Amino acid sequence: MSALSESPAIPSFWRPETSEISKKPRPNTTVGFQFDNRNVGTSAPSTPAIRRNNTDSFERGLSLPLPSSKQDTGSSVLDPDGDAYVNRYARPVTAGSIYIPSNYHKSFSPNTFSGFNVKRSASKSPKRSANGSTSEDISIEGSPSETAKGARSSFNSNFRTFDIGSERRRRILEASQDSSRPGRYSYRTKSASPALIDTSTLDSRLNFTMGRLERSIAQLSKNTMRAVSHLENPPKDITLPKLNVKNSAWPLQPYSPPANETPASSSSSAKARPVSVPDMSSPVPASSVEYESLKAAVTYSPSQNPKKVAETDSESRKSSFQSSYNDADRPFQVGAQTQSTPNRISRSDSPIVYDVDTHSEDNASTASSEAISQSMRSFQPQPNTGSPFPRFTSTNTEDEQESDIPQSDANDSTVNLNQPNYANLTPTPQVSPKRPTYSRSSPLPSASVPALGDGSPDPPAAPSIQNSLSVHESEMPPHVTRDYTQPAASATPVPKEKPSEKSEKPPKKKGSKLEKFCCILM
């Protein structure tokens, strides 16, 4: 039964126009323009367009000139009876007012409505059926029974249609949209709801996410091993769980059996089995084994703590990370079943230390909790310092620094305090002995300053070249020696005074390094 059939439950203005409502003016419940309002402003009576030529009515109703099947006789555009008449009062053709009659293929070329992206049917010459509708109408409209009941006839009426059951208009509007956008469902997609993603998509996304998470955990464990490899007793290796195994609980927790229960070891099996898998020959029923494994994995009690540092060798590290995945996917562990680990005691038996291992069962994805807490316990602070980061001290650092400083116990009071001792710091860059450099605190040498070998009894009170050179000598590293035979004023930019200064100054005797140090300290 069509949505537009005669029924008193449907409002009258939603019924098809084949009823008596089409003979009367449009009811006041809706507001809309007439398609054929050629007589706007005139006193001529309005003729229902269903009795006229449907093509002419459609051409005059649109607000753009369209080609006609008849020959144009040169009639005026303003002539209401002409074929090229354009109605300036009609609504413009927008996406909400697209109206295509059932016989548009007869009078227009196929490229007329190319802007609407209308999908025409494959039949080139549509054949008319008994009730006047074409086969193309049936293919676009829907079922032939729905077409025969009169849902199509509302398109040929005099008034603007206001029905909700127009399947054809919905398809035309969908065809006019751009369906090439990948993020949206195209109009060809038939689904109950676009928000319901199918289960295979969800499964594939979940598998991808779990595999990616497994790779991230492997990278994290590699970084962890690199970070703790310099410790005194680093963990030997980190056993990784397989996360994307089917029917595996997530996150996988390491299974450690309780202290009062020793799991039955199957010595007959060639391969070590995980502890959480119940052995059929075990006297313990399978349900209690699963319950104990779940309780050990989920429950966290702070009294559980690894017992001894000496017992956490490679065997206990291998058996401390038993996870509940399949036998075939599980790597072969050598001593997995040979040693049970009941080494858990209460915290009151051990001295209270700063323990980082607050959640002993919580780090299934990085490493075994015993190995991590054991490596972190080697980082305990010194007993006398309250800081968690102990100061890094080396045994021979201060001795090396003190050996560079010249020791003079007798002449401590005569040391010039204004001269800093840079012997234990970074040495100044080595200067070639041909061009002497001077310290920044002393002035540059001038010609008025007396030379080195003048025979003056005492050095002057003003800072002279000799004082500056001795200060610079104290700043230099001990392996750098300076030749003082050259004149001090040779670095002056005046080239004329160089030969005269060389002839005036007698050569100075070069002293040994010990004499220079004594001169500095005196």
Swiss-Prot record:
<feature type="compositionally biased region" description="Polar residues">
    <location>
        <begin position="363"/>
        <end position="396"/>
    </location>
</feature>
<dbReference type="GO" id="GO:0032153">
    <property type="term" value="C:cell division site"/>
</dbReference>
<dbReference type="GO" id="GO:0097248">
    <property type="term" value="P:maintenance of protein location in cell cortex of cell tip"/>
</dbReference>
<feature type="compositionally biased region" description="Polar residues">
    <location>
        <begin position="27"/>
        <end position="46"/>
    </location>
</feature>
<dbReference type="GO" id="GO:0031520">
    <property type="term" value="C:plasma membrane of cell tip"/>
</dbReference>
<feature type="region of interest" description="Disordered">
    <location>
        <begin position="170"/>
        <end position="192"/>
    </location>
</feature>
<feature type="modified residue" description="Phosphoserine">
    <location>
        <position position="350"/>
    </location>
</feature>
<feature type="compositionally biased region" description="Polar residues">
    <location>
        <begin position="131"/>
        <end position="146"/>
    </location>
</feature>
<feature type="compositionally biased region" description="Polar residues">
    <location>
        <begin position="66"/>
        <end position="76"/>
    </location>
</feature>
<dbReference type="GO" id="GO:0051285">
    <property type="term" value="C:cell cortex of cell tip"/>
</dbReference>
<feature type="modified residue" description="Phosphoserine">
    <location>
        <position position="43"/>
    </location>
</feature>
<feature type="compositionally biased region" description="Low complexity">
    <location>
        <begin position="439"/>
        <end position="452"/>
    </location>
</feature>
<comment type="function">
    <text>With tea1, acts in a positive-feedback loop in the microtubule-mediated regulation of cell polarity. Involved in the anchoring of tea1 at the cortex as well as the correct localization of tea3.</text>
</comment>
<keyword id="KW-1003">Cell membrane</keyword>
<feature type="compositionally biased region" description="Basic and acidic residues">
    <location>
        <begin position="472"/>
        <end position="482"/>
    </location>
</feature>
<feature type="region of interest" description="Disordered">
    <location>
        <begin position="251"/>
        <end position="285"/>
    </location>
</feature>
<keyword id="KW-0597">Phosphoprotein</keyword>
<feature type="compositionally biased region" description="Polar residues">
    <location>
        <begin position="404"/>
        <end position="431"/>
    </location>
</feature>
<keyword id="KW-0472">Membrane</keyword>
<feature type="compositionally biased region" description="Polar residues">
    <location>
        <begin position="335"/>
        <end position="349"/>
    </location>
</feature>
<feature type="compositionally biased region" description="Low complexity">
    <location>
        <begin position="258"/>
        <end position="285"/>
    </location>
</feature>
<dbReference type="GO" id="GO:0051286">
    <property type="term" value="C:cell tip"/>
</dbReference>
<dbReference type="GO" id="GO:0009898">
    <property type="term" value="C:cytoplasmic side of plasma membrane"/>
</dbReference>
<feature type="modified residue" description="Phosphoserine">
    <location>
        <position position="303"/>
    </location>
</feature>
<feature type="compositionally biased region" description="Basic and acidic residues">
    <location>
        <begin position="308"/>
        <end position="318"/>
    </location>
</feature>
<protein>
    <recommendedName>
        <fullName>Cell polarity protein mod5</fullName>
    </recommendedName>
</protein>
<comment type="subunit">
    <text>Interacts with tea1 and tea3.</text>
</comment>
<feature type="compositionally biased region" description="Basic and acidic residues">
    <location>
        <begin position="495"/>
        <end position="516"/>
    </location>
</feature>
<dbReference type="GO" id="GO:0043495">
    <property type="term" value="F:protein-membrane adaptor activity"/>
</dbReference>
<feature type="region of interest" description="Disordered">
    <location>
        <begin position="1"/>
        <end position="83"/>
    </location>
</feature>
<feature type="region of interest" description="Disordered">
    <location>
        <begin position="300"/>
        <end position="516"/>
    </location>
</feature>
<feature type="region of interest" description="Disordered">
    <location>
        <begin position="119"/>
        <end position="158"/>
    </location>
</feature>
